[in-house]
Amino acid sequence: MPSIKRDTTITEYQDFIRQVYGLNNDRYFSTEDMLTQIQRFIMRGLKGVRKNDKEKIKINLLVASSWFMSLLNQLHIEIEGEVWKRFPHLCSYCASCPCACKDKHPEKRQKVAGDENRRPKTLEGFQTMFKEIYPPDKRTLEDAGVHLAEELGEFSEAILAYRGKHNDSGFENIILEAADLFSCYMTLYESAGINAAEELYNTFSDNCHVCKKSPCECSFEDIMGFKS
């Protein structure tokens, strides 16, 4: 039976989402539908940021990130490797850790090459890595929320552009934007004082967090009516 372990890897988490929600996703939702669900729950999470409501931030980020994994599964994008390629314990733009973009003012993205020995082994390890690259004391919670919204917009644009042209370069852009969006999930979790791996374990340790079944047996009406 699928479950999320406390020390889950990103790949294990993505596979859990595939096993539990893949059937319903295939039956009920297109890529654009799932993108709407990501937007829906991120916006609810940002309402939590505005109200300084940690519980509202937490549940909505957890649900949004699981829809994000569902969309990546539909597109057959294994995100863990892509995140490491984009952020090999370094800022993807200035190639420094911690990020020094404000000091260096790089005019273009620098080439990044990481040390595989420093690659995190777990989701919690990746959250720690992003904490080191982008220290939470350098931004406010609101800053982290706005950045997540910005990257969500860029990810959405990449999806829609690819659906319009169906070319390889467009698909590669989706992968890059997905890695950027993942990084912003991690930095908002960190700014809010939320351990993503621990909360995913608490929420999804017994299959679907609503019906407790695998595969999920929630109806379309249940999914669309979920309150958070």
Where are the regions that the model predicts?
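Flexible "arm" and connector segments at domain edges
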Residues: M1-S228
